[in-house]
Amino acid sequence: VRDPVAFAAAHPGVAIAGTFEGALNNGGELVAISDSQGDEILAFSYDNDLPWPDRADGGGPSLVLIAPGSAPDHGLPQNWRASTAPGGTPGDTDTVSYHGGDLLTYSLAGPVILDVLTKTLSASLMPGADGVEIIPQWSTDLVHWNEDGFDYLGGEPRQWGIHSPPFGGSRLFFRLRVQER
């Protein structure tokens, strides 16, 4: 943190790992973390433009890594979300735990929408429902499902662009596969 006194006042009881002279520019950059010997532990780039979570673009929620225990690729925007609270939750989590039951009820906050004009599939996710992975799929026969042909576009609701399913055929079906992480 840059100002340990201000941080301690805003987040009492949260341990501070160290101080940082600069500041993130909220415009996207390379983040590199090194150990005391100068050896790189982690390096990744982030951005404040889509497909990165746009609600975490300064002045409100912070970026939160989804399911950090699963060692996700930090450089992929779909592995991040906006925090549920302004400023984030340093030293704590805002993840809503999954305790069994219907995965769709746990993970989705609204309807799944297919827009054939823009060729997008979108879904509003429950804030903090990090215990699941959402995977868009398409089929022409409701038996064989394909996961290829989608581009993650980001946003809230989350959107996927559809670029390779055979639009124009007599039948085309879409769904979201929801599975535990």
PLM regions: where:
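Intrinsically disordered, low-complexity linkers and terminal tails enriched in Ser/Thr/Pro/Gly
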Residues: 1-109
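Short, composition-biased motifs enriched in small/polar/acidic residues
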Residues: 86-181
